[in-house]
């Protein structure tokens, strides 16, 4: 898993892996670069975004597998938007708790030192998700 978003570096890693261990799978660790990684030979992605929006990540995988460029573009841009919402606070996993609650899935509260969004922040986030067609 390469958690970076530098696709030139990912391509270099892929060349090394393909030369040394062709049976080894290298995957991007960010859904924001899943399409690029797939085009460079990755067969999957380790995507934190899939914790909250698995349907979008699975749809992107299907579009990539089918070569549907228009759908790939649409979904990749949607994932980048979702990641922006997940990043409104420094720790994306903590925001994911609130995103899941907004979607109707109560997974409790984040453990300290992480914290939940304020009611205002949650309300604003819900509105952004609605306006984006994500809920």
Please provide the spans of the model-predicted regions.
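Flexible C-terminal active-site loop/helix
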Residues: 105-135
């Amino acid at each position: 898993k390469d958690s970076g978003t530098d696709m030139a570096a990912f391509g270099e890693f892929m060349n090394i892996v393909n030369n040394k261990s062709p049976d080894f799978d290298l995957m991007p660790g960010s859904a924001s670069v899943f399409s690029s990684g797939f085009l460079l030979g990755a067969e999957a992605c380790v995507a934190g975004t899939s914790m909250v929006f698995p349907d979008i990540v699975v749809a992107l995988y299907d579009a990539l597998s089918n070569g549907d460029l228009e759908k790939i573009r649409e979904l990749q841009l949607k994932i980048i938007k979702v990641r922006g919402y997940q990043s409104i606070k420094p720790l994306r996993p903590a925001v994911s708790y609130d995103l899941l609650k907004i979607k109707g899935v109560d997974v409790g509260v984040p453990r300290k030192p992480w914290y939940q969004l304020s009611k205002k922040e949650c309300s604003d986030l819900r509105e952004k998700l609605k306006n984006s067609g994500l809920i």
